[in-house]
Design a protein with these regions (language model features):
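Hydrophobic, small-residue-rich alpha-helical packing segments that form membrane-like cores
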Residues: 15-19, 38, 78-83, 87-89, ...
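Active-site metal-binding loops of divalent metal-dependent hydrolases
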Residues: 44-45, 70, 94-95, 129-130, ...
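Conserved beta-strand hairpin/beta-sheet module of binuclear metal-dependent hydrolase folds
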Residues: 9-61, 136-138, 143-153, 158-159
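Rhodanese-like catalytic fold shared by cysteine-dependent sulfurtransferases
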Residues: 101-102, 163-165, 177, 224-257, ...
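Metallo-beta-lactamase
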Residues: 37, 120, 130-250
């Protein structure tokens, strides 16, 4: 749309596009000016070819690359995008030296403003989720002098706000989460001053680990959040701090790695990895030298016939998160799965910095052709579990989130979150059968593969998980 002057008004020229990545529930944005043909990208994902292609299709030039903060849940593609397009990076200089980016950029502070064509960006410092966090208040100046959009990053979500505990719980910065919660409370008081009509465009949606109750709609308004967002309905600071910190989900362990890589200089990966097909000899040589095999097939296939020591992480929207929980960033990666899915799998891995993909195989034949046996974990129904758990002295291991376990579990079950299982293997019995369950069977499959890696052979995967147990009407603690 081009600007057309009339006697009364000018038609807006703003370009806007949300790019949503379901796996990490991550929203990035392209915001620009069609008249000047320039556009900014906010909180870019790492596979930046998406933005370059959109800009090409829309006859736009990417000139500005923006970030709201140093992200913990994904590896930001700002540097790759700037390298490929010649755009300049505009990043926060708030929060103090400890939270400063270690590479060249245009530093932004509260009250700064800049233009992308005719589109004005005003910078707000909104500490709470992180000390350096900033937001962008956007005005389409040909249309009005009144701001219309607020790009809130991990500050305000639909129905929630960003968690302030990640620096302490995931990155090891002791004593930061209470201070962060108080900063969040103060930042929200300023947020309340915004007009109700302003659209809010956050960096995450439902399913993200960056909050505990994010809504599942793509955007919201200031007025709507004032009505329904729990964080804006609490006016007592002490109650707010307690409520914000209570019940936050377990942060994936890879978050600490993302914090470091997003802040420091690192090697750039400017294209999606394209792994090669491995022949049996090369596959076995890589495995012998420590390569980790990621079995991305459906759990019904991996649990029934798997390559020994492989990790079973199905290619679905949770792949990035569970790969971050389970894989070693210092080891090479081999993908086992359908060839048609490899581009998607590689994108999901590179988005969290897992770049050391050395090849792929599309079947277990590379193992069995050498007359090597496959491994498996038997399934057990909830009816069998109920019948056998007392008579057979079965140890029930529930690998769901702590909040899920607290809401209800099989009587006598033991809880260890699947992501922390590696750190608690010594607590598991070697002389009892272990029945592993999650909500429906996906996380328990991952946990079973980890247990097999560490020598546990007396394990069962519970079909349908706790959902099936509960649906059957069995007793619950």
């Amino acid at each position: 749309m081009r600007t057309l002057s009339t006697n009364h008004y000018e038609i807006p020229t703003m370009f806007f596009r949300q790019i949503y990545e379901k796996g990490l529930a991550h929203a990035s944005y392209m915001v620009g000016c069609q008249k000047s043909g320039t556009v900014a990208v906010i909180d870019a994902k790492r596979d930046v070819d998406t933005y370059i292609e959109i800009a090409r299709q829309e006859n736009l030039r990417i000139t500005h690359v923006l970030e709201t903060h140093i992200h913990a849940d994904f590896l930001c593609g700002s540097r790759e995008l700037a390298e490929l397009t010649g755009a300049e990076m505009f990043l926060s200089d708030e929060g103090g030296a400890e939270w400063a980016y270690a590479f060249e950029h245009n530093g932004l502070r509260d009250g700064h403003s800049f233009m992308v064509g005719n589109i004005r960006f005003d910078v707000w410092h909104t500490p709470g989720h992180t000390p350096e966090h900033i937001c962008f208040l956007v005005t389409d100046t040909p249309a009005s002098s009144v701001p219309v959009m607020f790009f809130s990053g991990d500050f305000v979500f639909v129905g929630d706000v960003g968690r302030p505990d990640l620096l302490e719980r995931a990155a090891g910065y002791s004593g930061t989460m209470v201070d962060g919660a108080r900063q969040m409370f103060a930042s929200l008081q300023r947020f309340r001053t915004l007009p109700d009509h302003i659209q809010i465009h956050p960096a995450h949606g439902a399913g993200s680990a960056c909050g505990k109750s994010l809504g599942d709609v793509p955007h919201t308004t200031v007025g709507y959040e004032k009505l329904v967002n729990w964080a804006l309905l609490i006016h007592n600071e002490e109650l707010f701090v307690k409520t914000l910190l209570d019940g936050q989900p377990e942060p994936p362990q890879y978050f600490a790695m993302m914090k470091m890589l997003n802040k420091e200089l690192r090697p750039l990966v400017s294209a999606v990895p394209k792994p090669v097909l491995l022949d049996p000899a090369r596959f076995r040589a890589l495995v012998d030298h420590g390569a980790q095999v990621v079995d991305t097939r459906d759990k019904s296939l991996s649990t029934n016939a798997a390559i020994p020591n492989s990790l079973w992480i199905a290619n679905n929207n949770a792949l990035s998160t569970w790969a971050g929980w389970m894989l070693d960033y210092n080891q090479e990666i081999i993908i086992l799965g359908a060839k048609s899915q490899f581009d998607e799998i590689c994108r999901r891995l590179m988005r969290i910095g897992l770049d050391r993909i050395v090849g792929y195989v599309d079947s277990t034949d590379v193992w069995t052709d050498a007359h090597k046996p496959l491994t498996h974990v038997p399934w057990m129904s909830v009816a069998q579990l109920r019948e056998l758990r007392s008579a057979e002295n079965i140890y029930v291991l529930d690998v769901r989130k702590a909040t899920e376990f607290a809401d209800g579990h099989v009587p006598g079950a033991h809880h260890i979150h699947a992501g922390y299982l590696r750190d608690h293997l010594a607590e598991l019995p070697q002389d009892r059968h272990i029945a592993v369950m999650c909500a429906a069977g996906s996380r328990s499959t991952i946990a079973c593969s980890l247990l097999l890696q560490h020598g546990f052979t007396n394990i069962y995967n519970i079909t349908g998980g706790f959902d099936a147990w509960n649906a059957a009407g069995y007793e619950v603690e």
